[in-house]
A protein has these predicted regions:
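Ferredoxin-type iron-sulfur electron-transfer modules in oxidoreductases and energy-metabolism complexes
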Residues: 347-363, 373, 377-440
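Hydrophobic alpha-helical positions that pack around
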Residues: 196-308, 314-319, 329
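Flanking helices and flexible, charged tails adjoining ferredoxin-like Fe-S electron-transfer domains
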Residues: 102-132, 137, 150, 167-169, ...
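N-terminal, Lys/Arg-enriched amphipathic/low-complexity engagement segments
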Residues: 1-48
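Short, well-structured beta-strand-loop connectors
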Residues: 50-63, 82
């Protein structure tokens, strides 16, 4: 039987061997913790503490700022030292709550947890929302909102994104290996919300051990299926995953719910389980630290707010001064100029690369080879769109579906002329979106 997949895509060296066999290690922070109030899509959270307040681990320090928002909790005990703008992983300055860690990790007394069997759908959604769970594999969309579509009866599929297709990142892989019960438990909780839905675990076939574990845990679950996907980037893209597992296609103007689907990644489903079954707020995540500049690549369970420099030190520091620092994956992540930034809800990895691993090539003229067209999972013509972008031709850019680009970088990866196709198209997309907002 042919493996499930999508059209286009590429096969970069995955680099996962550096960390895939490293068990998750818990790291306790030493210095101050910084909590940006914007760690999710939507309205920023509103601080509910003041400078000088003493807080406990698990205490809410910022409440949701609206329907599309999420609260933030202290991941250590200590004293609020400041509420002020602070550098975040994207390079911007965001209003943040700074807590001086007292090293005692005194925790709040969590309210008694209601048995899952006795919880209503509303109870489950409220538990997820109150815990501050957001999408931990992408842009950080508040999970309670995602699980509250207007017509829940039309949701046919709950898809667990277990692809982890970005090179070097192995955080989800280790989570699937070490705590698969919580992942399956998270899926079962979501299925409680959608009576007509079937659960799918979409796992790339380079993770046969995960496929085996998940099949064993779900063998008596008629509503859940484990699907092996062809290992190819960007298999973990939302559109590509939905197409591969269900055969349904969506575009940039649609939500997965429009195609009867809800997609959550591994870390998010585990957080859902912890929120509903254990009654714990979202306070930590697993982060991969890898790359050829890192002394001891590995996977680490860390509290939100920990300084990324501390996390790199937990991985033995850098054996060679890195030429490039990346937050997230090498394909869709972003470069960092400083490690003096916190781990947030959406921080999946920290990558450090030496100059030998960083491509530095001068772009030249397009040779019309068509490789970018073959690689594009959105079935676009990236070379043409990049030309329109470079000439600031918004009309032609939108006419030729430039807004359908998901900025996966496949086109730039295969381009023999080394043209910065993704960067040009991505910049133009931002301009178009900004102009559309002005017209509203």
């Amino acid at each position: 039987m042919a493996l499930l997949t999508f059209k286009g895509g590429i096969h970069p060296d995955d680099g996962k061997s550096l960390a895939k066999d490293k068990a998750i290690v818990e790291v306790k922070p030493k210095g101050n913790l910084v909590y940006p109030v914007s760690q999710h899509i939507g309205a920023p959270a509103n601080p509910v503490v003041a400078v000088g307040d003493h807080v406990l681990k698990g205490q809410m320090i910022a409440e949701a700022g609206g329907f599309v928002s999420a609260p933030i909790y202290a991941s250590v005990s200590g004293t609020v030292k400041a509420i002020a703008p602070h550098l975040n992983p994207t390079g911007g300055r965001v209003n943040s709550i700074v807590i001086e860690n007292d090293g005692e990790y005194k925790e709040v007394e969590y309210p008694a947890v209601t048995l899952l069997e006795e919880m209503s759908k509303e109870d489950i959604l409220n538990a997820i929302g109150t815990a501050g769970v957001v999408g931990m594999g992408g842009a950080g969309f508040p999970t309670k909102v995602k699980l509250s579509p207007k017509e829940p009866e039309k949701i046919d599929y709950i898809i667990a994104n277990c692809a982890e297709c970005e090179p070097y990142i192995t955080a989800d892989y280790r989570t699937m290996i070490e705590t698969p019960e919580k992942l399956v438990g998270g899926m079962k909780i979501i299925l409680r919300l959608f009576d007509n839905a079937k659960g799918i675990f979409g796992v790339e076939d380079n993770k046969p051990d995960c496929i085996e574990k998940l099949k064993e845990l779900t063998k008596d679950e008629p509503r859940i299926e484990v699907m092996a996907l062809k290992t190819k980037y960007p298999q973990g893209g939302e559109r590509q995953l939905i197409y591969a597992t269900t055969g349904r296609a969506i575009n940039s103007t649609m939500l997965p719910a429009d195609a009867g689907c809800v997609v959550d990644n591994v870390a998010t489903m585990v957080s859902i389980y912890q929120a509903v079954v254990e009654g714990k707020p979202s306070m930590e995540r697993v982060v991969t630290v890898s790359g050829d500049a890192v002394a001891e690549p590995g996977n680490f369970r860390v509290p939100f707010g920990i300084n990324q420099q501390e996390l790199v030190e937990a991985a033995g520091g850098f054996k060679t001064e890195p030429e490039k620092l990346i937050s997230g994956g090498p394909m869709m992540g972003f470069s960092m100029f400083s490690l003096d930034v916190p781990v947030t809800k959406t921080s999946s990895s920290i990558l450090g690369f030496t100059k030998d691993e960083v491509a530095k090539m001068e772009p030249s003229a397009c040779i019309n080879c068509g490789r970018c067209v073959e690689a594009c999972p959105s079935r676009l013509i990236p070379s043409r769109l990049a030309d329109y972008a470079e000439h600031h031709d918004e009309e032609k850019f939108t006419k030729h579906e430039g807004m359908e680009c998901m900025e996966c970088g496949s086109c730039s990866f295969v381009c023999p002329a080394k043209r910065p196709l993704k960067q040009a198209i991505g910049s133009m997309r931002k301009i178009v979106m900004a102009n559309r907002r002005k017209k509203k």
